[in-house]
Amino acid sequence: MNEKAKLPMLEPSDSEESRVFVKKAFEMSEKFNTPVLLKMVTRVAHSQSIVDTEERVEPDRVPYVKDTAKVMMTLNSRNAHIRVEERTKALIEYAESTELNRVEMGEDTSVGIITDSTSYQYAREVLGDKVSIFYQCLSSLLNPYMSIS
């Protein structure tokens, strides 16, 4: 979650995840009615890896609906802020339960690493399956490693 903009942000660790996350970003955007950021770092953008392809799916054409409530003018800002806060709560719940974030248990479960993006690949390359890794692709809240109650 991008704390300042209160937008969800996906951080892929390789080319295949980039492809999957673009599709996931569109799904999340439709579900939560919000833009979704895809954070690309130079290492991933310049990398090459095997990518699985899927059958192309043509999206349904949705007619344009003029919605002035989405135009940020003083008149709309108070209601928009309420909607953003409600959406943020829903996104936090989603981030804490999504299959995008995963724990990979290693041989030594007394040691764990919290990673995202390319640091996941670095940790796997150096440590292999020796330690447990919490791989966080979609973070939640201001402190992305803590759950709220």
Give residue spans per PLM region.
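Flexible glycine/proline-rich, aromatic-decorated loop/lid segments
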Residues: 1-4
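Flexible, low-complexity linker and terminal segments
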Residues: 12-149
